[in-house]
Amino acid sequence: MTDPTPPLPTAGPDTDRPERQHWPWWPLLPLYPYGRRRTLVRELLPDRLWSFEQLQGVWYVAVPIRMSVLRLREGLMLYAPVAPTAEVLDALRGLEQRHGPVCTIVLPTSSGLEHKLPVPAMARAFPEATVWVTPKQWSFPLRLPLAWLGFPARRTRVLLEEGLPHADQLDWLPLGPLDLGLGTFLEIACLDRSSGTLLLTDALVAIAPEPPALFDLDPTPLLFHARERGDEPLLDDPECRRRGWRRLVLFANYLRPEPLDVPPLMEVLRHALAPGCRSPRSHFGLYPFRWRAGWEQQADALMAADLSPRVAAVLERLVFPRQRHALVAWLRQLAALGELRWLVPAHYEAPVPISSHRLCRLADELEERAWAPDGGPWEFLSRIDRALVDLGVVPGPR
């Protein structure tokens, strides 16, 4: 297998055009970077698999979200679409010219709104493509039919219930359905037999110590969180980028990291009013964070230079706290699919070297270690889970 090729950005000094990166539907899910979605396109496996990556997050806590584009005999399959800006569509048209039409669009999760929202617009851009969705789709606060959410009724199919796309080339394996109370978690993994590549959505991630290349297009989130106070400037150097990335990882996994304090309001406002800080890029100097000693060690525990896959902490504690058995069984089923070479999740790093042995080892580790703990860095997530159980929003222990 040829090693993955280096990143090839679609945006740069000469091509970074805001009008080509506009996403008009962002108010339906108002996440950073709002209406402007820069996209990085990387060829992960030569002439076989491509990654379309965009940033997405809250308060500059932004991590990559990925659409995988897989070349099949019939054309191209889009797995977990991202916002189809003009920049994204231009890149897809270029792939179509070389490898055939976009014939299949897959929404591989029932609950991930960030993956669900782009699908109708992507489907309209490729009117000949069949749209496949997981069973148990749901919306909140009202349960609406998919057609009311913009999915094309005449060419939308339900995975497993109405067949499987490209079953002669791909294997499909569901995790779930798992009862979340408000709705259902169901994710379907896809194995490309030819390349040994396993496409996933949210269940597993691999987090590298270095910031993803996507931040080269806009390092602002890294630089914002690399600071200690709001009156400090946004300095761009490798060390600031690494420090900002480690803090972003803590936020994204634990929501409120344990070694983090919120300074008094008057202190935050005093720093915000300092000269030189009154710009939108720095949120006008508002920086309500104070990091305590030990945060680096907690960040390092989430990262792996060898890209070992893991369950994201926020999913383990809020989605899977009472579903360890189902997750472990799914990992063992994935390991039995065949010869595995690469793992491509919809977030963080990709491609990740993988094997059946590595997945079985991860399953063993999850069975043996403490699961969804309550203390230390998990304390805030644990409080959220207990509150949701007490309110009857999510099911409690059985």
Regions found by a protein language model. Give the residues of each.
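A short secondary-structure junction signal
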Residues: 142-144, 183-188, 199-204, 208-214
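Metallo-beta-lactamase
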Residues: 36-37, 135-188, 193
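Conserved beta-strand hairpin/beta-sheet module of binuclear metal-dependent hydrolase folds
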Residues: 35-91, 186-189, 197-200
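Short internal beta-strands
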Residues: 103-110, 129-139
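Divalent metal-coordination and catalytic microenvironments
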Residues: 70, 109, 190, 202, ...
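Beta-sheet entry/capping signal
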Residues: 76-77, 104, 130, 196-197, ...
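Cap/insert and terminal regions of metallo-dependent hydrolase folds
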Residues: 82-83, 94-104, 110-125, 208, ...
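Long, non-catalytic terminal segments
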Residues: 2-54, 384-397
